[in-house]
Amino acid sequence: KKYKKISPISLQIKSPKETGKTFIENSRLKVKFFSKYVDFPVISDDSGLCIEALNNKPGIYSARLAKKHGSFFKAMKFILKKMKNKKNRNATFICSLSLNNRKGKVTCVEGKLKGKIATKIKGVKGFGYDPIFIPFKKKITFGQMPKLKKIKMDHRYIAFQKLKKKIKI
């Protein structure tokens, strides 16, 4: 099936404040909010990077950390500075998806990809924290990986596969 992707920006809808304490809470909050404006199914996501040695931060504040520092590049430098003497470099990319089917049912799933934080920024591909995240069993960051290879293994792909299975597409 073909689906048309419509973003809140194209509908001139501002995103709601993310007041949830988890990725799923924020994803659910957004899907309920955006569903008020349209009469078709809506999928919303909330994603981020959780670093064990930093008490799972930036977590739900991943995008806000980049905004606070002025860019993802500066946020990555900030993270690498905090990680400088840390032995535990384990991290997890998380994507929570919520689907409102327009019949009053909201379905939520979460995709997780474990990896580790690189010692320096490597690569220019992808976006966000991709240049410092090395998936387990890989030797390069997402920022160094070809786009198609990254897309077929990342946390969003995992979440969409779970959603697809749950709603039986």
Ranges and model annotations:
Residues 1-169:
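Anionic-ligand binding patches
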